[in-house]
Structures are given as structure tokens and as C-alpha cells.
């Protein structure tokens, strides 16, 4: 009887320790993802602020003591930013030829894409889904018709509205049926079960300078 009680006690202690370890790992993962999301948003915001054009103030030359220069942080070579307010997404993207334009590192501008300033062109961007660090498009499937997607590029905010959210077979080819008389944005990622490709088709509705 005593041995049986000791065994049960050990089982309870071990079980409690395993539960605490599991909870700690889960909490650490969520905290890491939260701060990674904040860092991504900050990088995108830094890029948008850095490329804003402002009229330089008139300065009067005067002698000053030399100041120690603070190193300026790079803008990560982004050429633009994708913003999707309904899923709290904001992320910079790179030139097609940039080594960081890679779906395993970032969202990826697909080959033969046009930039938003090309009338009736098509900009296609892919990203991973799932739960990893680079699963930037994990919530893409939640987008609905008329949801807004903004592209910040070359000092202009291009405003798109979602026209379709659909799935196609995952075979390396994305069938895009669109109105060729409209400037188009396509965002794509894997479906939750990885057997299909989620495709978001959006059309340009407005653009404003910033």
C-alpha cells in the first residue's frame, strides 16, 4: 500500500512537471510570434515613413560644434509594402531580383509581375501559410469580397478591393481568370490542408500620394 501511494505521488509530480514544461513552451512560442509580428510591422512602417517626400526647410548657415553622427538604420531594401487591415497584416516586399525576394524568407513577388503603376498590369505575391516564422499569409484565407488591400509603392498608396477568394489545385500553376482591363493584384498561399492553393484576386479602385 505504501509503495503504491509513493508511485502515485511520483506520477502526479512527474505529470505536473511535464504540464508546466508544455505550458512554458507554448507561452514562449506565442510571445516569440507576437514580437516577430511587431518587428515586421515596425520595419514596414519605417519604410513608409522613410520614403515620404517633404519640402526641405530653409536653413541659415552658422558655425556649429561638430556632432557625432548616429548610424542610420537601413530600410531593408524594400521597394514597397503590402497592408491588409482586416487581418492586421503589414509587410515589406523586395525587387524581383533581390536575393531576399524568396518565399522561404519573406513574401515573394512572382516572376513576370508588374508593379502597381503599370496600368492594367498584374502584381502577384506569394507567401507561406501554416504556423512557422515565415507563415506570413497564414490568415489570407479569411479575406472576403470588398476587403481592402493597400500597396505602398513609389510614394503612392494603391488601394485594391478583393473581387474573389478561391482555391485551385496545387500543381505549380495558378489559373487566374481576371478582367484584363483592370489593374490587378493577386495574393496566393497554400490552403490549410496543403492540397490546394488559395488565390485572392483584387482590383485597383483608387490611389493617393503620400
Could you tell me what each predicted segment is?
Residues 1-5:
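Juxtamembrane low-complexity tails/linkers enriched in Ser/Thr-Pro and polybasic
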Residues 6-210:
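Solvent-exposed, non-transmembrane regions of membrane-associated and secreted proteins
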Amino acid at each position: 500500500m505504501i509503495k503504491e501511494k509513493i508511485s502515485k505521488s511520483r506520477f502526479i509530480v512527474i505529470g505536473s512537471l511535464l504540464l508546466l514544461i508544455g505550458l512554458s513552451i507554448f507561452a514562449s512560442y506565442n510571445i516569440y510570434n507576437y514580437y516577430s509580428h511587431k518587428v515586421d510591422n515596425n520595419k514596414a512602417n519605417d519604410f513608409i515613413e522613410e520614403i515620404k517626400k517633404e519640402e526641405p526647410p530653409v536653413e541659415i548657415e552658422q558655425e556649429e560644434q561638430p556632432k557625432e553622427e548616429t548610424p542610420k538604420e537601413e530600410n531593408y531594401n524594400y521597394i514597397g509594402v503590402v497592408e491588409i487591415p482586416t487581418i492586421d497584416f503589414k509587410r515589406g516586399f523586395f525587387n524581383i531580383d533581390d536575393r531576399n525576394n524568396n518565399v522561404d524568407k519573406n513574401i515573394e513577388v512572382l516572376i513576370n509581375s508588374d508593379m502597381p503603376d503599370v496600368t492594367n498590369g498584374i502584381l502577384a505575391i506569394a507567401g507561406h501559410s501554416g504556423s512557422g516564422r515565415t507563415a506570413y499569409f497564414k490568415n489570407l484565407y479569411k479575406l472576403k469580397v470588398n476587403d481592402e488591400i493597400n500597396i505602398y509603392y513609389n510614394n503612392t498608396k494603391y488601394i485594391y478591393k478583393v473581387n474573389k477568394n478561391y482555391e485551385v489545385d496545387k500543381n505549380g500553376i495558378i489559373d487566374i481568370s481576371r478582367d484584363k482591363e483592370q489593374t490587378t493584384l493577386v495574393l496566393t498561399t497554400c490552403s490549410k490542408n496543403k492540397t490546394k492553393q488559395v488565390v485572392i484576386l483584387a482590383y485597383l479602385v483608387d490611389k493617393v500620394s503620400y
